[in-house]
């Protein structure tokens, strides 16, 4: 099966304090109307981070600051295998303008399940929620380290693992 390598920008209002995530509804093709994180194919000679910046410039006419890798999603569609590097991003300059998507929404943690995500993108939602759940409550951990910890333990009740005095 053919593998297609892509990137996705999980654009948040602030990488340091995530309260909203930007999502778009695909404006073309088989999955038209399905919700996704903006991004696209990695071109030859490009790093995944460079691809994120280029794709957001092409699709949304803005420049993003690329943060940490959230995860690499491996997903089998009927016709191809998708390998998608997903990065935290925030707008560095410009305003997000829809050049390819048919709609967009800023979603809070509570609203992330309110849209119909594309199959590969939906697999990332629990990890995003885990990182958003504890923002602002961390006092003794570096936010990046804690977010990484939350992602690794997203299938467990994190508050039972970490001493109560941290929250």
Per-range role (PLM):
Residues 1-21:
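Conserved N-terminal beta-strand and adjoining loop/helix that marks the start
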Residues 30, 97-144, 148-150:
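Nudix hydrolase/Nudix homology domain
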Residues 63, 72-96, 103-105, 109, ...:
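Active-site-adjacent beta-strand/loop module that shapes the phosphate/pyrophosphate-binding cleft
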Residues 18-58:
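Conserved Nudix-box catalytic region and its N-terminal flanking loop in Nudix hydrolases
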């Amino acid at each position: 099966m053919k593998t297609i390598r892509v990137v996705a920008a999980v654009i948040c209002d602030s990488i340091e304090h995530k309260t909203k995530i930007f999502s778009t509804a695909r404006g073309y093709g088989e999955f038209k109307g399905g919700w996704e994180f903006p991004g696209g194919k990695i071109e030859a000679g490009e790093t995944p981070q460079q691809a994120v910046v280029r794709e957001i410039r092409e699709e949304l006419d803005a420049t993003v600051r690329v943060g940490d890798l959230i995860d690499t999603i491996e997903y089998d569609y009927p016709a191809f295998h998708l390998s998608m590097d997903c990065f935290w991003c925030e707008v560095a300059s410009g305003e997000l303008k829809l050049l390819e998507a048919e709609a967009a929404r800023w979603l809070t943690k509570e609203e992330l399940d309110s849209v119909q995500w594309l199959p590969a993108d939906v697999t990332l939602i629990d990890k995003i929620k885990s990182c958003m759940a504890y923002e602002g409550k961390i006092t003794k951990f570096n936010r990046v380290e804690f977010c990484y910890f939350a992602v690794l333990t997203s299938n467990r009740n994190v508050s039972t693992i970490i001493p109560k005095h941290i929250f």
